[in-house]
Amino acid sequence: MPEHNNGLTYHLLRVPLRTGSLYPRSENDAQAYRDAHLLRCLEAAGCQVFDEGDVAIPSYLPHHNIPPIKNWPGPRIAWDCIGECIAPYLQQPGHIPLLISADCSIVVGTAQALMRVYGEEVHILYVDGDIDGVAPQPERCLSAAAMARWMAT
């Protein structure tokens, strides 16, 4: 294994969530990263990484199509769970939570947790296959995932 020389420790967390996403059964998409041995690949690249399992998300979250935000307040509850889970890692210098999810809306909870620790000067690199920047519309029910970037800014 290559020598770990950047002093960073990564904490791999899966976010089993679909409340903010459009498609059902996407809550287990992060399993594909585990099946592809992401942890082993990161270790082979010299990273110190720990598989911390799943972020605890309640199973009772609502599922509905009531405008303007699908399944609300489910996404808000999930974002709070994410923030509580990653807060201890963010408070340790050199520890980085690496969140894997099929639900783009987790960027909101992650950004909020980062801002609680680091203040307003948080910068996020958001990589996705589409824009996720739709603004809420009172007459249309949209997923929180579709509005993720809009809500995070």
Regions found by a protein language model. Give the residues of each.
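Conserved alpha-helical scaffold segments that buttress catalytic/binding sites
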Residues: 2-153
